[in-house]
Amino acid sequence: MAKQDAIEMEGTVTESLPNAMFRVDLDNGFNVLAHISGKIRRNYIKILPGDRVKVELTPYDLTKGRITYRLRKK
């Protein structure tokens, strides 16, 4: 999958699952299962339920994604 093919959306983490998987409610109402990208894992960025995140989705499977960024709280 090329980088430009990814669909990037924002959402809220609703549930933390084993193996660094998370259930994320997207802003458009869909619910996806997402894992953490390598840079977030390498830099030990903690993701907790309630955090706002950016998720990359592939056009082939819109039910799974990758968390690429944790948004700052305002």
Swiss-Prot record:
SMART domains the UniProt entry points to: S1
InterPro entries for this protein: NA-bd_OB-fold, RNA-binding_domain_S1_IF1, S1_domain, TIF_IF1
SUPFAM superfamilies associated with the record? Nucleic acid-binding proteins (SSF50249)
**Top-level taxon in the UniProt lineage:** Bacteria
- Entries under CDD domains matching the protein: S1_IF1
Molecular function per GO: ribosome binding; rRNA binding; translation initiation factor activity
Which ranges carry the S1-like domain?
1-72
**Function of this protein?**
One of the essential components for the initiation of protein synthesis. Stabilizes the binding of IF-2 and IF-3 on the 30S subunit to which N-formylmethionyl-tRNA(fMet) subsequently binds. Helps modulate mRNA selection, yielding the 30S pre-initiation complex (PIC). Upon addition of the 50S ribosomal subunit IF-1, IF-2 and IF-3 are released leaving the mature 70S translation initiation complex.
Record family assignment: Belongs to the IF-1 family.
Give the record's subunit note.
Component of the 30S ribosomal translation pre-initiation complex which assembles on the 30S ribosome in the order IF-2 and IF-3, IF-1 and N-formylmethionyl-tRNA(fMet); mRNA recruitment can occur at any time during PIC assembly.
Q: What is this protein called?
A: Translation initiation factor IF-1
Q: Which organism is it from?
A: Acaryochloris marina (strain MBIC 11017)
